[in-house]
Swiss-Prot record:
Pfam families assigned: Methyltrans_SAM, PUA_3
SUPFAM superfamilies on file: PUA domain-like, S-adenosyl-L-methionine-dependent methyltransferases
Name of this protein: Ribosomal RNA large subunit methyltransferase I
EC number(s) from the headed UniProt entry: 2.1.1.191
Keyword Signal: no
PANTHER family: RIBOSOMAL RNA LARGE SUBUNIT METHYLTRANSFERASE, S-ADENOSYLMETHIONINE-DEPENDENT METHYLTRANSFERASE DOMAIN-CONTAINING PROTEIN
Lineage of origin: Bacteria, Pseudomonadati, Pseudomonadota, Gammaproteobacteria, Enterobacterales
Physiological role: Specifically methylates the cytosine at position 1962 (m5C1962) of 23S rRNA.
Entry's family note: Belongs to the methyltransferase superfamily. RlmI family.
Species, as recorded: Salmonella choleraesuis (strain SC-B67)
Length: 403
């Protein structure tokens, strides 16, 4: 398509001097950078973004109710946002996942990681021959039909299931959606394989898309620390860390979660891998409360895995989240035997690695223990971070030796 045959998109005009982030190819335009919208645009509709003098900068999606007024689809003026566009993006992303899946023997991985794969607001996880779709932005929802058509072209043998039932959609004025899109319904529990483990995934009712693929490498790394050790697995969900700890030869692993359904699946995962169920304990409880009870009763562990849900959704919550992370890590440090290992994580995008490391250091001081940082973690390689969007590095973690 030549430029002369392009549709005339509405134009989002930026205030003077507010184009710098787009010139650096950051994919978001915040409300404070906007001067005006020329023309009419529906929620999620494609718009052109220009500087205060009318110079073209990018093409994106309009979201008037969000602090992120526009999310960029492309920095190429000659690129139209259509089925062919989504097909190109999918095939580009698949090249890396094909190599990774073959290299690591994976049957499940993140196929599309939003902005880092050039598709802002789009998350797609692949579990076997099921594609699980999450559309998190107005632009992604507006392009639903084109995206699904591209998926059917690229993956004709895969079923597509929608898990766009996340609260963040409400911020952009969208309803929550869930259900089959094409093909068969996923089974209640779908078995996948990960580094020698067999794990059951609840696509329809589980957290997010059903399973935390981003922690794959951290689960594998756990095995080097747990041989003949007593392990506490906090916020255990369906037991991926527990199964990995048992495969690493731990003496005992105690998994704690507030969801009985998740703990039941964790138990099934231990059995599915033919591991010694007598070494696995499953506790339904609040982690903060249980850690305090363990401290009062003098319980001790050799390894503690701390993988909490996101504590912070926006900048106004950051200080409170810092206190929460410090308190829970302080409790964990107090429960570790000398020489014990704390594997601790944060999946909050607003929590930088440097800030998280400082929080762990402060927690150690409050616990009256010395801590050595011995290993650093991040999301698995199927969750890439494009250089112009550092916010994409949301998962960070540390292995700490507690003296």
């Amino acid at each position: 398509m030549t430029e002369s045959t392009f549709p005339q998109y509405p134009r989002l005009v930026l205030s003077k001097g507010r184009e710098k982030s787009l010139l650096r190819r950051h994919p978001w335009v915040f409300s404070g950078a906007v001067s005006r919208l020329e023309g009419k645009a529906n929620l999620g509709e494609t718009i052109d973004i220009v500087d205060h003098q009318g110079k073209w900068l990018a093409r994106g999606a309009w979201s008037p109710a969000s602090q992120i007024r526009a999310r960029v689809w492309t920095f190429d003026k000659a690129e139209s946002i259509d089925i062919a566009f989504f097909t190109r993006r999918l095939r580009q992303a698949q090249q890396w996942r094909d190599w990774l899946a073959k290299k690591d023997g994976l049957d499940s991985y993140r196929l599309i990681a939003g902005e880092s794969d050039g598709l802002p607001g789009v998350t797609i996880d692949r579990f076997g021959h099921f594609l699980v779709l999450q559309l998190l932005s107005a632009g992604a929802e507006y392009q639903r039909a084109a995206l699904i058509s591209a998926l059917q072209t690229c993956y004709p043998d895969c079923a597509i299931y929608d898990r766009s039932d996340v609260a963040v959609r409400k911020k952009e004025g969208m309803a929550l959606t869930q259900g089959p899109v094409t093909g068969e319904l996923p089974p209640a529990l779908l078995p996948i394989e990960e580094y020698g483990m067999k794990l059951l995934v609840d696509i329809q009712g589980g957290h997010k898309t059903g399973y935390y693929l981003d922690q794959r490498d951290s689960r594998l790394a756990t095995r080097r620390y747990v041989e003949n050790q007593r392990v506490l697995n906090c916020f255990s969900y369906t037991g991926g860390f527990a199964v990995s700890a048992l495969m690493g030869g731990c003496r005992q692993v105690v998994s704690v979660d507030t969801s009985q359904d998740a703990l039941d699946i964790a138990r099934q995962n231990v059995e599915l891998n033919q591991l010694d169920l007598s070494k696995a304990e499953f506790v339904r409880d609040d982690v903060f409360k249980l850690l305090r009870a363990y401290r009062e009763h003098g319980e001790k562990f050799d390894v503690i895995i701390m993988d909490p849900p996101k504590f912070v959704e926006n900048k106004s919550q950051l200080m409170g989240a810092c206190r929460g992370y410090k308190d829970i890590n302080m409790l964990a440090i107090q429960l570790l035997n000398p020489g014990g290992i704390l594997l601790t994580f944060s999946c909050s995008g607003l929590m930088t690695s440097d800030l998280f490391q400082k929080i762990i250091a402060d927690a150690a001081i409050d616990a009256g223990r010395d801590v050595q940082f011995i290993e650093q973690f991040r999301q698995a390689a199927d969750h890439p971070v494009i250089a112009t969007y550092p916010e994409g590095l949301y998962l960070k973690g540390f292995a700490c030796r507690v003296m």
